[in-house]
């Protein structure tokens, strides 16, 4: 086992060294932009050449290109480069789309052998565009598409999509409860999807799942996505955290949240929150409504800063499968979720599940089902990393049976105020991506099978995004710390505890004040 761990670390180190080496010392930022392989940009003055990063590690630089009629191949004229960027054949080129890791547009002078110049695959922003988060670039708003009810765009979003999908190799399906949905009688639901971050977002699918609510109850999803009828929701009788009573934050699904500061010496340090519920028997579940703090976003941004000019090239190695994608999320994995244990009367505690929903924006509400015997008051213990979670709602659900939901595809889509049938078709089919840029707004409408007040609604989104490198981060490039973050996240969390602790008080405010709007 030790050999496997050492080998994995060496592979990451090699990939990282190549990434940093490819950036070189004389870096010149020319705003490279990523594109979905299925949707290459049209040639023109703004895109005079196209870099085609292949999954094999090779590269094509094309000065003209097109998709084949059946959209299965990318064809054009240009030059091929080996894995070490040695120049190969010139002339006509043709590659299968499924062999492409990334597409990139910028300028041809960026292509050089390893060790002499940049071969970035990230958009880098300076000046006015990044001024929205100039106060603290590590506090910039970001983390996937955000969703709002109409007229509520200035408040907190009701959902955020695929927060952990920071690359195409990490594309994932995300389902979030619209738990705070308005209980009206309308049979139509409109959601506003925004790209409010300095990101390129690629959305493959959007749809709703509608489940009939039991009389006077709710429908809750467990971490595996199974739906359960919640016949009754019982608030806790007591809530104790290290700072004292936390009952007011836990009893209702509202704006009140319980949160602590991160540990100043080790960001992985755990804390305990204790709950007490009346005795219960039968099938029950702990209901957890929570979202992450800005800590996880800060660590992601800091890792990108450490990678610096090599961030894009390292990302390409992830896309090609040379590095386990999970290693890019190493510090987040160490921070972990909210581990829950339960005990009845004088019985010992037993684990009942883990809540672990990525993202600091909207969070989610889930249930952790377990069986209770009624032997005495029900005690629940939550273990979580200090400063990593905001607890907004805690309850005990009396569960009924499993519930089936009906999938609802969009019936109309508008982009930036204009009808967009192409996006509608993509969201419904899920066979291609709709690419959004900062400031883009989509209004997505769904027809409901009954009055909204009688339905539990869940939003499914599928896709990925690429964060844009901030020009201010390039001065923090540190290959040693980048390697540490990717190969020894425990030690990285100890070293980053001090820097985060110093900036923690203002990060949340900077995050929410830097939403990007056109």
List PLM regions with ranges.
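Short beta-strand-plus-loop segments that form exposed binding edges in beta-rich domains
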Residues: 381-389
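Bacterial Sec signal peptide processing site at the extreme N-terminus
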Residues: 19-40
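Bacterial N-terminal signal peptides that target proteins for export
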Residues: 2-12
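Activation corresponds to long, low-complexity, non-globular regions
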Residues: 128-375, 389-518
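Hydrophobic alpha-helical membrane-anchor/signal-helix detector
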Residues: 100, 110-135
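Hydrophobic helical h-region of N-terminal Sec-dependent signal peptides
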Residues: 12-20
